[in-house]
Design a protein with these regions (language model features):
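Short alpha-helical segments that sit at the start of domains
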Residues: 1-14
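A short acidic, leucine-rich amphipathic alpha-helix
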Residues: 27-33
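Short, Lys/Arg-rich nucleic-acid/phosphate-binding segment
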Residues: 61-67
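Short, hydrophobic-biased segments on the C-terminal half of alpha helices
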Residues: 45-49
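Glycine-centered, phosphate/nucleic-acid-interacting loop/turn motifs that mediate DNA/RNA or nucleotide
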Residues: 55
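Short capping segments at the starts of secondary-structure elements
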Residues: 18-27
Length: 69
């Protein structure tokens, strides 16, 4: 069964597709704000986690513990 994506998840997916590069959740938050699609940082993290669990995004964890999506 396909899960329904939230508006926040859709916005994040669109930004990730347009960037064509890996980005941290913090940088994604800043990018969303610059595109006037502001949402809370906690919302960004929750949406990324849900997208990861659905297999829509891949995560890579760097040696310093930072995750890139």
């Amino acid at each position: 069964m396909k899960t329904q994506r939230t508006r926040s998840q859709e916005r994040i997916l669109n930004v990730l597709k347009s960037l064509n590069r890996s980005i941290s959740a913090q940088d994604l938050y800043i990018e969303l704000r610059s595109r006037e699609m502001s949402m809370g940082l906690a919302t960004v993290y929750r949406a990324l986690e849900a997208l990861k669990l659905d297999g829509m995004v891949q995560v890579r964890t760097l040696a310093n513990g930072e995750s890139l999506y």
